[in-house]
Amino acid sequence: RYLEICIVNDKPIGFLYGKIDRYGDKGYIRPGYAYIMEFYVKTEYRRKGFATQMFGRLQSLFKKDGAKIMYLTADPITGRPFWERMGFIETDQVNPDNQMIIFEKEID
């Protein structure tokens, strides 16, 4: 599991939480996929590159630990545009936990 906090000028401005589903715990994603469970940046710090840097760090951690594909669900208004810019593609799967569309990306 990965929990990281982004700090700017000694203040937390965002965080991320992810894991690699090694055993297929979720039941609808194949084992070995990385899962971004939570990702947040305070509104006033958005569109300044912090989220992109945070995502790059998480992607590197996933890659280092052997994941080849990552997935997430995204808020259609605030999250989807960002994740599509990061290279995520909509799948035909729906997360049964939150009824949101699952997006996937090969890890660079």
Regions found by a protein language model. Give the residues of each.
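Conserved beta-strand in the GNAT
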Residues: I5, K11-I20, Y35, Y40
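Active-site beta-strand termini and strand-to-loop segments that position acidic
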Residues: I7-N9, K105-I107
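Residue-level detector of high-confidence beta-strand sites
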Residues: F15, T91-Q93
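A conserved beta-turn-beta hairpin within the catalytic core of GNAT-like acetyltransferases
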Residues: D21-I36, R46, D97
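Conserved acetyl-CoA-binding loop-helix of GNAT-fold acetyltransferases
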Residues: V41, R47-S60, R85
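Short acidic/polar active-site loop segments enriched in Thr and Asp
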Residues: K68, I89
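Conserved beta-strand-loop-alpha-helix junction that forms the acyl-donor binding cleft
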Residues: Y71-E84, P96-Q99
